[in-house]
Amino acid sequence: MSYRMFDYLVPNVNFFGPNAISVVGERCQLLGGKKALLVTDKGLRAIKDGAVDKTLHYLREAGIEVAIFDGVEPNPKDTNVRDGLAVFRREQCDIIVTVGGGSPHDCGKGIGIAATHEGDLYQYAGIETLTNPLPPIVAVNTTAGTASEVTRHCVLTNTETKVKFVIVSWRNLPSVSINDPLLMIGKPAALTAATGMDALTHAVEAYISKDANPVTDAAAMQAIRLIARNLRQAVALGSNLQARENMAYASLLAGMAFNNANLGYVHAMAHQLGGLYDMPHGVANAVLLPHVARYNLIANPEKFADIAELMGENITGLSTLDAAEKAIAAITRLSMDIGIPQHLRDLGVKEADFPYMAEMALKDGNAFSNPRKGNEQEIAAIFRQAF
């Protein structure tokens, strides 16, 4: 392969493994935090002795005062950020602790941006638009999927236009990420399935991205291998600690990969489904992934053949194209095995919206690193294939 200059961004400090949550208080201390805004959702806050309660325990044990904002919604909205910012300012917080999956992490990043930048958040959509440092962010992760705890991406929904927008900046990187698989035990099967397919999409899109490099390739390949071997088990038995730990590790690797290699049309298209229909992000990715993969296959069949082998397919004696086709079959079979809906029509999507969603998908920042350049008609056709 040809080598070029590339950068590689991850949070300053990353903790992984059982009981990793125990470091959250001391890490906030080391970052100079006196009063934390804990950003989460009402469902997580209601769980007795769950991730929120454990985080509160270790923060208070370290002498950190805490104000709680639990108004985060799925596909976090600009209004969630506005409400969280009001708490951050009213309580005079100086550090942000996010607890949950991608929605609390993205909302927390949005609060940090809004606290340090003037004007509407939408004006910062794009790459490296932020000019000021954010408050320190400590991200406590509870799902194996979005990997927002280790990325520079902040994905929010404009409630007026119902369009998701992405603010990509190294300033969004949490100061500390915490992945404790014990916090993931007992998550519902449907959530595990959706977030797991989100992680697979991250790994696949990073691996075939135009911006891939040797380091992101290594992370993405191991993530694909781990997901293929562990996602079914994690869905089947949520208390399977080995499967949970492997999925948490896979999600972390996939996040490190796409944080630097970027993504592609699956995410660009899924963002339209999330913005317009409030569809769970992992489900949108899972439905679209096989169809976008088929579209992208001719751009890099060698890497799709690699994906097939990483997912356990026997490609001995096959041509590169035939081996690449097996990757699509393996992705589809995994999605079906774990109960992911297979058609957009079953999720309330309207065909009449495809032209608009195709237009907006090509404007999404994730579209620019897709390995095959498409037009609105081709993107609309992929939506129809998934319908």
From Swiss-Prot:
PROSITE patterns referenced in this protein's UniProt entry, alphabetically: ADH_IRON_1, ADH_IRON_2
Q: Which InterPro entries match?
A: ADH_Fe/GldA, ADH_Fe_C, ADH_Fe_CS, Alcohol_dehydrogenase_Fe
**Record text on subunit structure and interactions:** Homooctamer.
This protein's source sits in the domain of life called Bacteria
What does the sequence similarity comment in the record state about its family? Belongs to the iron-containing alcohol dehydrogenase family.
EC number(s) recorded for this UniProt protein = 1.1.1.202
Q: Name one Pfam family in it.
A: ADH_Fe_C
Protein name in UniProt: 1,3-propanediol dehydrogenase
The family database entries (CDD domains) matched by this protein are listed as: PDDH (cd08188)
Write the record's keywords in alphabetical order, separated by commas: Iron, NAD, Oxidoreductase
Q: Decide whether keyword S-adenosyl-L-methionine is in the record.
A: no
Give the reaction(s) catalysed: propane-1,3-diol + NAD(+) = 3-hydroxypropanal + NADH + H(+)
Molecular-function GO terms, alphabetical: 1,3-propanediol dehydrogenase activity; alcohol dehydrogenase (NAD+) activity; metal ion binding
Q: Which cofactor does it need?
A: Fe cation
